[in-house]
Amino acid sequence: NVRLARPEASDDEVRAALDSAHLGAWIDALPRGMATMIGEGSAHVSGGERARIAVARALLADQPVLVLDEPTAHLDADTARRVSDEVLSEERGRSIVWITHGTIGLDAMDTVIRLEG
């Protein structure tokens, strides 16, 4: 599922993206680890796991611009902070657009644009 972002990625690269999204322990607990099929539309995962899978895909794609829409939605505050810290540490010269209703992660941004209405 995560490898869809970059089919030629090695298992180590996929695992690094999963770890950055704080999914490593969850993956390890699955019956077949990274080879476990999780179902169409991610029907067998929680909202938080689904959000972190999307983050892992985005990190694995390794594009120059990373657009994350509510990347920490459905996560508890501690996990949201850890995921945001990890994503922002993976910046590697790319631009990150972080769309959020919350404030977690905004303190690390170079520029914050607030829309009200």
What are these regions (language model features)?
Residues N1-E40, S84-D85, G93:
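ABC ATPase nucleotide-binding domain helical subdomain, centered on the C-loop/LSGGQ "ABC signature"
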Residues G93-H101:
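Conserved H-loop
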Residues L60-P64:
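A short, proline-enriched helix->beta-strand linker immediately N-terminal to the Walker B motif
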Residues L66-E70:
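Catalytic Walker B motif of ABC-type/P-loop ATPase nucleotide-binding domains
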Residues D107-R114:
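Conserved catalytic segment of ABC-fold P-loop ATPases
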Residues A80-R92, I104:
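Helical segment within the ABC ATPase nucleotide-binding domain
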